[in-house]
Amino acid sequence: MFDEVSVGYDRMNTVSTVGIDALWRIATTRAVDPRPGQLVLDVAAGTGTSSAALARSGARVVAADFSPGMIAVGERRHAGNPNIEFVQADATGLPFDDDSFDAVTISFGLRNIVDPDAALREFFRVTKPGGRLVVCEFSRPPASVIRGAYYAYLEYGMPVFARLASSNPVAYAYLMESIRDWPAQQELAHRISRAGFERVAYRNLTFGIVALHRGFVGESKGDL
């Protein structure tokens, strides 16, 4: 499915969010806090838009995605960036050694993984002691008025944008369903903690349409 929408994926995201996705990306990058020389894993990186934002700090970024189509587009777009390496990978079985990354992040991809809990455990496995995880994902607005308006937009507004801007509106119908079915903020925080991360907290972006979760790996991880 993602292979079929890879070429127009970024355009559709910008159109359907009225450009707010750029602000969410800035917030995510700040939460990851990438630093020169650090190694960051960007899971479900798609065409590498978020990876490029992370790499501007001087960090080295591994952009991992399950879709060969997304990887191909990303490699073409970022061919001149020596700080980004694209890798085709399954988030539930990452091809990396334990304790490989200073930070792991995933934006708008966790809900599309068949077994999100297995993916979270993999994120914990490959993160170094003292490292951090940042998850940016669509969520559930806590205010009923905002939630109702948002769900109405998903039902009636986004399909219009999908038909105008996407080569595969059916794929975006699935994405809308996955957003509605995704757990609320507190439940996701619990699942991240259950995977092994400590000091898990979240903050809402755009009235809770998106939530930014962050957790840390304890320094004693290597003793477990």
Regions found by a protein language model. Name each.
Residues 1-8, 154, 165:
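N-terminal, positively charged/glycine-rich alpha-helical extensions of SAM-dependent methyltransferases
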Residues 8, 18-38:
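Conserved alpha-helix/loop element of class I SAM-dependent methyltransferases that forms part
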Residues 39-93:
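Class I SAM-dependent methyltransferase SAM/SAH-binding core
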Residues 92-103:
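A short acidic, Gly/Pro-enriched loop at the edge of an enzyme's catalytic core
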Residues 102-116:
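A short SAM/SAH-binding and catalytic strip from SAM-dependent methyltransferases
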Residues 117-132:
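A short glycine-rich, Lys/Arg-flanked "PGG" loop and its adjoining helix->strand segment in the class I
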Residues 136-191, 195, 201:
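C-terminal alpha-helical "lid/dimerization" subdomain adjacent to the S-adenosyl-L-methionine
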Residues 195-224:
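Core SAM-dependent methyltransferase catalytic element
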